[in-house]
Amino acid sequence: MSTSSSIEFELNGQKVNALAGETILQVAKRHGEEIPHLCYKEGYRPDGNCRACVVEIKGERTLAPSCCRVASAGMQVFSNNERARKSQKMVLEMLLSDMPEDGFKWSDEAGDLPHGELSDWAHRLEVKPRPALQQIARAPSQVTDASHSAMV
């Protein structure tokens, strides 16, 4: 697949072809590579808000959200190396730690995925929130916001 409307880059050490304007996440999905993602949905504008889909791009200092980063020729992308996986897992863990313990009743009748896609990705990446994070996230606030009379 080497046409003028496609470019070639490396994804986890494998050469892949991307169509012009295609994001790293779209290319990865097309080539059978799974990258965690929560806020991306085909057909909608990608915003990269959840940060679960971050990848490392060789030569760049910061991780990039694969859902809104357009692939470019020659780039080397790593979605499953230690740095990317650690960040992906941290995002999932932080989100899980702030969820209700019993989950959301609407998501899964069997109870296997109490938090929907979040539970699914956490299960796939073997992420479980640390009890200390859950305690912090669920602790009642000790500070009362008195910045406005309606809030007291």
Stretches found by the model and what they are:
Residues 1-3, 105:
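Intrinsic disorder at enzyme termini
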